[in-house]
């Protein structure tokens, strides 16, 4: 993927971004077996919705969408960064909550599958989810390989990593792509007219209908594409030892995100450290649900499709 990270911006550290207001949005399930998952309302148009009978009691997370501030008009670098984080962080948390709820439901269905209690509707939901996350349902059906692939892919992305890449790729929200195409992650497309043309090579930068779509699409890329298999393995490694998945650790696996390779990774880590973005990976959310149907399958590795 070609990166548009070349937008220049300063990287002085900020001193907090109203943590009391934002921290409750950040959640990470308690790994592993069973994960503690937060309940959410799906937001993206392509979201796989639950049947009413399968929804959890209580209201899920909801985000009131507000237009992006004019970050270019904020003259002080620290103020611009704080505004960018305070605006984007709840939207990242909402998409993560959606992913964690899909994961919770998948783990619940794994438990049912071990007792041969999956209904036809539940099997159809699993097939739909697997299709959405590019997981094959082979001749053996929902075997160990299927569950390993699915649970490596249907999972949240560390908020620090999402914030860092959005900051780098959009110049803290000031780039033309972010303003005109809601593209905060340098994501490209290759059909004529699919996005915003650029000079210097084939393809265009993808145009999104809003920042929510941009975040969801970015997370789907990390969660499904072969180029980011190492990131998913690193995330699962953290889960298996009971750690919160680390954005800094995942960033070190993103050699394929930019043609700059290791230099891009070094820059991500620099921005993450200087702006203390890793602090956003450890906040707790009090709304959790535990799944106790069955122990999760062995998840040491994601099978090759």
Question: Which stretches of residues belong to each language-model region?
Answer:
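Catalytic cores of secreted/periplasmic lytic hydrolases that degrade extracellular macromolecules
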Residues: 2-164, 168-305
């Amino acid at each position: 993927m070609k990166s548009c990270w070349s937008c220049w911006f300063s990287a002085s550290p900020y001193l907090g971004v109203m943590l009391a207001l934002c921290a409750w949005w950040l959640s990470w399930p308690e790994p592993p077996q069973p994960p503690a998952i937060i309940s959410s309302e799906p937001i993206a148009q392509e979201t796989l919705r639950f049947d009413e009978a399968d929804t959890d009691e209580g209201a899920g997370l909801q985000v009131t969408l507000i237009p992006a501030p004019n970050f270019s008009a904020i003259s002080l670098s620290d103020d611009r960064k704080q505004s960018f984080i305070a605006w984007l962080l709840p939207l990242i948390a909402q998409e993560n909550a959606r992913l964690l709820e899909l994961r919770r439901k998948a783990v619940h269905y794994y438990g049912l599958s071990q007792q041969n209690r999956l209904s036809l509707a539940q099997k159809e939901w699993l097939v739909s989810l697997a299709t959405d996350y590019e997981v094959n349902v082979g001749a053996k059906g929902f075997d160990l390989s299927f569950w390993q692939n699915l649970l490596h892919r249907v999972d949240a992305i560390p908020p620090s990593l999402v914030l860092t890449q959005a900051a780098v790729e959009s110049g803290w929200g000031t780039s033309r792509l972010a303003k005109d195409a809601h593209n905060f992650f340098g994501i490209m497309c290759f059909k004529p007219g699919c996005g915003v043309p650029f000079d210097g090579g084939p393809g265009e930068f993808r145009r999104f209908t809003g920042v929510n779509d941009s975040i969801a699409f970015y997370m789907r890329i990390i969660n499904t594409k072969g180029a980011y298999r190492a990131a998913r393995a690193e995330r699962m490694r953290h889960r298996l030892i009971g750690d919160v998945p680390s954005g800094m650790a995942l960033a070190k696996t993103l050699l394929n995100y930019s043609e700059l390779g290791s230099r891009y990774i070094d820059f991500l880590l620099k921005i993450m450290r200087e702006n203390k973005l890793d602090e956003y990976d450890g906040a707790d959310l009090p709304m959790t649900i535990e799944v106790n149907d069955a122990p999760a399958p062995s998840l040491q590795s994601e099978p090759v499709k």
